[in-house]
Amino acid sequence: MKQDIHPKYTKVTVNCANCGNAFETRSTRNTIKVDICNNCHPFYTGKQMLVDTAGRVERFNKRFAKSTASQAKAQ
């Protein structure tokens, strides 16, 4: 086997840009910066917002009803 072909695997600190949380892991990179981590991600914190699409569906159905009504009048 070839000697010294693998990169250095060292301890690095991962920094979250959103909440400032930092934790240590191992990697071949020198620094790791993440946009969102498990401390500030909505799924993990329980602050997940549900998107209400009922208004959008109703608006689409209303538009679609108008277009089908105008097509029926044209025939």
Swiss-Prot record:
PROSITE patterns tied to this protein: RIBOSOMAL_L31
One Gene Ontology term from the biological process aspect of the record: translation
Cellular component GO terms, alphabetical: ribonucleoprotein complex; ribosome
Residues making up the signal peptide according to the UniProt record: none
Molecular function via GO: rRNA binding; structural constituent of ribosome
Gene3D superfamilies: Ribosomal protein L31 (4.10.830.30)
Transmembrane segments annotated in the record for this chain: none
Keyword set, alphabetical order: Ribonucleoprotein, Ribosomal protein, RNA-binding, rRNA-binding
Recorded family membership: Belongs to the bacterial ribosomal protein bL31 family. Type A subfamily.
Subunit structure: Part of the 50S ribosomal subunit.
NCBIfam families attached to this UniProt entry: L31, PRK00019.1, PRK00528.1
PANTHER family, alphabetized: 50S RIBOSOMAL PROTEIN L31, CHLOROPLASTIC, LARGE RIBOSOMAL SUBUNIT PROTEIN BL31C
Annotated function: Binds the 23S rRNA.
HAMAP family: Ribosomal_bL31_1 (MF_00501)
Protein name: Large ribosomal subunit protein bL31
